[in-house]
Structure formats: C-alpha cells, structure tokens
C-alpha cells in the first residue's frame, strides 16, 4: 500500500477514526484524523483569547501558522474544544487552510508509506483522487450514543 491514499468519510460519531486506526495498524499506514487539525486550531484560537466570532482575527492568526501538528490529539478531545472546532469548521477560509494542511501532511508521509485519512468530506472534497474511498453509514441513534460516550470519556 505504499504511496496509496485511503479515505474514510461519514457523519460525526459513525466510527470513522476507529475504522481508520484499525486499517492503519493492519496495513502499516500513516493515519491522519482530520478532526484533530480543527481541534488543534481551535485550541490555538482559545489560547490566544480570540473570540470564535471574530473572523478577522482568526484569519490574521492563520497567516502566522506554518504548520498544524496532528500529534497528541487526544488531549484536544474536550467539550470546549470540540464545540469550538465545530464552529470554526463552518468558515470557508479555515476549511481551505485545514484542507491545505492535510494535503501537506499526507504528501510528506507518502514519501515513506501509504496514508489513511478520516474525516467529513475527506474523500469527496479534500482527497478526490484517493485510491480507495470508504463511506461509513451508521444509524443516527447509534451515532448519538457513540458521540455521548466520547464526550463522557
């Protein structure tokens, strides 16, 4: 699977990350959870005391960020950061910035191995030419229970 891109797409709470982690471990692929990048950016915005509605300050902040690291993302799975990530993800400039970051990260990893990326719209928007595209469909009640459990844990 060297130099191949696999995407795992689907709604929140569908199990995209779990599926992607399993495949990454099984096939020795680099795994990128795209949601971590939104959470990392949200954390940076919060640490800089920028109001989530102040798009001008957020856009100015983006100009000063060279790279967003996907490492140590579990620390970012708080309700405050998750809510902020959902809010900023609706902004086109932020989505474009994060999409570009994802492409850079994957390009750097493809030199060494294949990649699997999970996230919403990851196969239809960001990596349209992925070698394999997986779309996860899960009942809404199950998704809601999964999301609730994630927030509690």
Q: Which residues does each predicted region cover?
A:
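Short, well-ordered beta-strand core segments
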Residues: 115, 131-135
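Phosphate-binding P-loop
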Residues: 1-3
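ATP-binding Walker
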Residues: 11-14
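Post-Walker A helix-loop "phosphate-sensing" segment adjacent to the P-loop in P-loop NTPases
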Residues: 24-34, 47-51
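Hydrophobic anchor at the beta1->P-loop junction of P-loop NTPases
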Residues: 6-8
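ATP-dependent small-molecule kinase phosphotransfer cores
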Residues: 37-113, 121-126, 141-145, 149, ...
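Walker A/P-loop
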Residues: 17
């Amino acid at each position: 699977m060297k130099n191949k891109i696999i995407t795992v797409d689907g709604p929140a709470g569908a199990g995209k990350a779990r599926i992607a982690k399993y495949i990454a471990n099984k096939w020795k692929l680099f795994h990128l959870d795209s949601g971590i990048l939104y959470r990392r950016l949200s954390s940076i915005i919060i640490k800089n005391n920028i109001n989530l509605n102040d798009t001008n300050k957020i856009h100015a902040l983006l100009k000063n960020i060279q790279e967003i690291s996907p490492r140590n993302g579990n620390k970012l799975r708080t309700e405050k950061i998750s809510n902020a990530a959902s809010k900023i993800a609706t902004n086109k400039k932020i989505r474009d910035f994060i999409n570009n970051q994802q492409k850079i990260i994957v390009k750097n990893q493809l030199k060494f191995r294949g990649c699997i990326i999970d996230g919403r719209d990851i196969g239809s928007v960001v990596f349209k030419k992925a070698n394999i595209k997986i779309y996860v469909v899960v009942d809404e009640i199950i998704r809601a229970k999964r999301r609730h459990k994630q927030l509690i844990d």
